[in-house]
C-alpha cells in the first residue's frame, strides 16, 4: 500500500506556490506554443476570468551565444540553446478617444500585465492540464494577488462535473474567509490549520467536521462559516494580548 501511495504522489499531483507561481509561467507558455489541443481550453479559461484579452500568441526567442554573459557555465548555455525562452503576448484592443477599436496591440504578459493577470496566466496551464487528466493540484496561497471572486471561480471549476468530468482535485491554502461559504465548500472540504503552541513549529490540522462547538453541536450546514471562524468558534485564529476598539465604537 505504501508503495502505491508514494507512486501516486510522485506521478499525480502538481504543487504550486501562489506567491512564486512564475515557475509555472514556462509550463503554460510551452503548452500554448506546442500543444494546439490545449490552446483553446487555456484561452477559454483566461477569457472567462475577465482579464481584458482573449487571444495570446507565443514566440520562441533566438539565443545568440555571443550576447550571453561571458563566463556562463557551458551547461547553462547548452540548456538555453536546447530550451530557448518563450515569450507570451496578450492581444489588447487599441481604443481611440471615441471608444472605437482602431487596432490591436501586443503586451508582453510578463512585462506589462498586472501581478494578478500574470498569476492567472501562470496557473492556466496547470489548471487546464489537471482538469483534463483528472489529477490533483496543490496551490499554496491560492488567493494571493487574486480578486476574491476570481479565487472562488477557480474553486468552482473543480466543484462541478460539467467543468471537472474526470474528478480532478484542487487542494489549496488561503487566508481569504470569503472562501468559507456554504455556497462554495461543504463542511467536509474544509480543514483549519494552526500552530500547536507559540513556541512550537508543529502544525495542527482540524477538519471542520470534527469540530465540536461550545454547545456540544457540530457546525451546521446553514451556518455562516466565515463569520463563525472570525469569531473564534472554529479555532485556528491569531490571539492578541491587547485589542483595538472597532472604528464605530
Predicted segments, located by residue:
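C-terminal lobe/lid and adjacent interdomain/linker elements of RecA-like ASCE P-loop ATPase modules
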Residues: 153-249
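Short, contiguous acidic/charged loop-to-helix segments that flank catalytic cores in large enzymes
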Residues: 109-112, 145, 161, 180
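Contiguous, well-ordered alpha-helical segments that form the cores/surfaces of helical PPI scaffolds
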Residues: 121-128, 156-157
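Catalytic core segments in nucleotide and nucleic-acid processing enzymes
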Residues: 116-117, 148, 154
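Conserved D-loop-proximal element of ABC-family nucleotide-binding domains
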Residues: 132, 144-148
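Phosphate-coordinating catalytic segments in nucleotide- and nucleic-acid-processing enzymes
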Residues: 1-124, 225-228, 239-249
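Walker B catalytic acidic pair
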Residues: 140-142
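Short basic/glycine-enriched coil/helix segment immediately N-terminal to the Walker B
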Residues: 127-135
Amino acid at each position: 500500500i505504501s508503495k502505491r501511495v508514494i507512486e501516486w504522489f510522485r506521478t499525480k499531483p502538481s504543487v504550486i506556490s501562489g506567491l512564486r507561481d512564475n515557475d509555472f509561467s514556462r509550463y503554460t507558455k510551452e503548452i500554448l506554443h506546442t500543444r494546439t489541443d490545449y490552446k483553446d481550453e487555456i484561452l477559454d479559461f483566461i477569457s472567462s476570468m475577465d482579464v481584458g484579452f482573449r487571444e495570446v500568441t507565443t514566440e520562441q526567442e533566438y539565443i545568440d551565444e555571443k550576447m550571453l554573459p561571458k563566463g556562463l557555465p557551458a551547461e547553462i548555455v547548452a540548456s538555453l540553446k536546447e530550451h530557448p525562452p518563450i515569450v507570451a503576448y496578450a492581444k489588447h484592443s487599441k481604443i481611440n478617444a471615441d471608444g472605437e477599436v482602431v487596432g490591436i496591440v501586443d503586451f508582453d504578459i510578463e512585462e506589462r500585465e498586472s501581478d494578478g493577470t500574470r498569476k492567472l496566466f501562470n496557473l492556466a496551464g496547470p489548471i487546464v492540464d489537471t482538469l483534463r487528466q483528472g489529477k490533483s493540484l496543490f496551490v499554496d496561497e491560492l488567493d494571493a494577488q487574486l480578486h476574491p471572486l476570481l479565487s472562488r471561480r477557480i474553486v468552482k471549476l473543480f466543484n462541478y462535473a460539467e467543468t471537472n468530468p474526470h474528478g480532478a482535485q484542487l487542494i489549496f491554502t488561503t487566508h481569504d474567509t470569503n472562501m468559507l461559504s456554504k455556497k462554495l465548500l461543504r463542511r467536509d472540504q474544509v480543514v483549519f490549520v494552526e500552530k500547536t503552541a507559540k513556541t512550537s513549529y508543529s502544525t495542527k490540522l482540524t477538519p471542520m467536521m470534527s469540530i465540536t462547538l461550545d454547545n456540544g453541536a457540530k457546525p451546521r450546514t446553514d451556518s455562516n462559516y466565515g463569520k463563525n471562524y472570525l469569531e473564534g468558534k472554529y479555532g485556528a485564529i491569531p490571539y492578541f494580548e491587547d485589542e483595538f476598539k472597532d472604528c464605530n465604537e
